[in-house]
Amino acid sequence: MTSMYNFKRITCVPNAQELKDVVLSKTQRKTPTVVHRQYSIGRIRAFYARKIKFLQQTLHDKLTQIITEFPKMEEIHPFYSDLMNILYDRDHYKIALGQMNTARHLIDGIAREYVRLMKYADSLYRCKMLKRAALGRMVKLLKRQKSSFEYLEQVRQHLSRLPSIDPATRTLILCGFPNVGKSSFINNVTRADVEVQPYAFTTKALYVGHLDYRFLRWQVIDTPGILDQPLEDRNTIEMQAVTALAHLKASVLFMMDVSEQCDRSIEEQLHLFESIRPLFANKPVLIGLNKVDIRHRSDLPPEKAALLDQLEKEGIPIIETSTLTQEGVMGLRDRACDELLAQRVEAKIQAKKITNVEDCVLNRVFVAYPAPRDEKVRAPFVPPGLAAKRAQKKLQEAQELMETDGDEFAAKIPQKPGKIGKEKIAKGGSQSTDLGDLRDENTRRLEREIELEMQDDYILDLKKHYMLKNPDEKYDIVPEIWEGHNLADFVDPEIQSKLENLLREEELLEQAGEYESDLDSDDEETKEKLKLALQIREKEKLLTLDHAVNKRIAGRIGSRIHGSRKRDRSMSRLENELGELGVDVDTKKMKNLQGQCAKPQLGKKMKVGRSRSLSAVRPAPRDELAFPDEEKRAHVDKLRTKAMRGLRREAKKGEADRHVYDLKPKHLFCGKRGNGKTDWR
């Protein structure tokens, strides 16, 4: 159903036999099952009393769920209340729920009685018999309510199949004789698929379709056909339509068969319209002349056309439609929706929001004012005491007004020149506000009043009302304290003059050329020196990078390869590097050096003893390279050990260990123990 009434959520109602089996089985499963006569009598009594209480609580919960989930006739919308009365019989429905409630109270009483009797049982056998009697009596009550359980289950099934009707939303209701085209109309304007047959009473229940008009959601209700007979003679099918017309605030579409193929004449259809017309009160009503594809309104005899014209004179629109050719269908739908929208908007405008009962009563009270009979003034007599109270009340209201409204206060209080105001008026100023008439002599004047009197001459003084031992200290300068220090102790009173002296000295130094550079960088010699210095710096950077790369490579491959590496120093490299640095080397000297370098050594090498070669330099472990010193590494090791405590406590191998151990060993949870004498109980 809607958000208010969702009858589909009602739990299934078991029959008496099923409920008995369920509760007894649950009692046997959820309570202990082994007791021995060797136990103390208190333990035996508690064993059987627990079973009685458990069954009582289980039945209490089941019956309470049934009672609370079914809707109460007095609490739901009148439309659903009357519809349930028509479909299920209000008295039968209430009696069934009442029997459930009575059974619940009787079961509670039986349980209390037998738990009390259990205290006087002196053996296991007597306790068992009391438990058996208690369970038997409680289950016997369920068997006696067999018909009520079956009836409530049928009601639940039918309620869950009812259409989703929202009594508060925008609604169109189709009504009329059977077989006049109501179901065909709802199939055309909505996506509903109502069965359409050429015989009467094809529709035996309410059907709902939904449409969108002007970006709003509308529901269209197809009602069963209504026959022209007294209300007490109508059957259940017809009363569903009457209930919808009586309780739903909707636009009514009375469908008529102008071709008279529904075995009803125009006069009979209009007579039905007049008989159910009281149900259309305060609702927009439209008449749809259906089946105009067979017979138009203009083809009607004069006496029948006159009857329709009489309805139009009464303000009831009549629109010709044909559900076969779609003629006039959308026009009738739009006209009905527009009239209902206009009525809802007008009702919202005229409605007044009433918050409490007093406003509700005062809204209906008419106050009469007597007309004057002559020109004589008959003023009311006000006692002096009452006048003083009124003045005091005005003063309080004025003070509250000043606190809330601020500048608007001057426009809402009486204007009268005070002492200062009179002086200003004498000097040609404007009249100011005085509240002297609204207060007594002992009341202190507010700053707001003084401000209104003095206007632009007012200066706010918050220190004049300070209550100090020495009144002369009111206007002393309060020291500014920051973190326990007086800021005045850190301020040099002559700092401004000292700053001016420093600025003056700087100006004199600038004028004397103290900050001018002695190096003239415009001559050619200076430019050459700067260029050479730049080249030297770049060369140093390259050598530094080259050395770092070679050192890193040597550290990886070890000293064995380093010892057999080819000598990279040569005369050409030396000459190029010295030339780049601007050193002039004689060509002859370079040739002599080259010759000496290339001269091979003659003779055998002298065999001399040598010490053990250095081992290859092994790189440090990666987990140690990340730390700058040993202290940092020790701190990280401590944190790692602390983080692993939880894993060790849970016996996990590491952070990725997600193994779930067997929490239910089969030998402990199988049906029987291995010796064949005892079961799992």
Curated annotation (Swiss-Prot):
Keywords: GTP-binding, Nucleotide-binding, Nucleus, Ribosome biogenesis. Ubiquitously expressed. One of its GO terms (cellular component) is nucleolus. Disruption phenotype: RNAi-mediated knockdown results in an extended lifespan, reduced brood size, slower growth rate and increased fat storage. It is found in: Nucleus, Nucleolus. Belongs to the TRAFAC class OBG-HflX-like GTPase superfamily. OBG GTPase family. NOG subfamily. This is Nucleolar GTP-binding protein 1. It comes from Caenorhabditis elegans.
